[in-house]
Amino acid sequence: MSTQIDLVRRMVEAYNTGKTDDVAEFIHLEYLNPGALEHNPELRGPEAFAAAVTWLKYAFSEEAHLEEIEYEENGPWVRAKLALYGRHVGNLVGMPATGRRFSGEQIHLIRIVDGKIRDHRDWPDYLGTYRQLGEPWPTPEGWRP
């Protein structure tokens, strides 16, 4: 494996273990995943990534994990094909926990800058996950803070 793919594998390991004390070693100070802005719009860098790991475990249980399917690279970019497995145990954009298990494939595009992960976009299988959760409705309060 390449050094760039090794960095992405460390990211996946953090999601799987929940361990974030070393993320500054592989997450850039300017790290941004636009999909996480909904949860913490002001956070960037290793702190933003650590918050995303914490949220994943909160919403989908400590048993949530990403299975590595395939990695590809193109210049500074790494494409990771992963599958997420978990159980819905916490509030998910206004939808209370259902306790249901789910799985779904995802694509992650990650750019390495200065030897660290700086840019990160992911496209999970939202529709498939929503159906597996039983198509729950949000609470009356919804997802607005």
Swiss-Prot record:
Biological function: Involved in the biosynthesis of aklavinone which is an important precursor common to the formation of the clinically significant anthracyclines such as carminomycin, daunorubicin (daunomycin), rhodomycin, aclacinomycin T (aklavin) and aclacinomycin A (aclarubicin). These compounds are aromatic polyketide antibiotics that exhibit high cytotoxicity and are widely applied in the chemotherapy of a variety of cancers. Catalyzes the cyclization of aklanonic acid methyl ester to yield aklaviketone presumably via an intramolecular aldol condensation mechanism, although water is not eliminated.
Name of the protein: Aklanonic acid methyl ester cyclase DnrD
Highest taxon listed in the record's lineage: Bacteria
Pathway noted in the entry: Antibiotic biosynthesis; daunorubicin biosynthesis; Antibiotic biosynthesis; carminomycin biosynthesis; Antibiotic biosynthesis; rhodomycin biosynthesis; Antibiotic biosynthesis; aclacinomycin biosynthesis
Keywords annotated in UniProt: Antibiotic biosynthesis, Isomerase
pH dependence of this protein's activity: Optimum pH is 7. The enzyme is active between pH 5.0 and 9.0.
Documented EC number(s): 5.5.1.23
Organism lineage string: Bacteria, Bacillati, Actinomycetota, Actinomycetes, Kitasatosporales
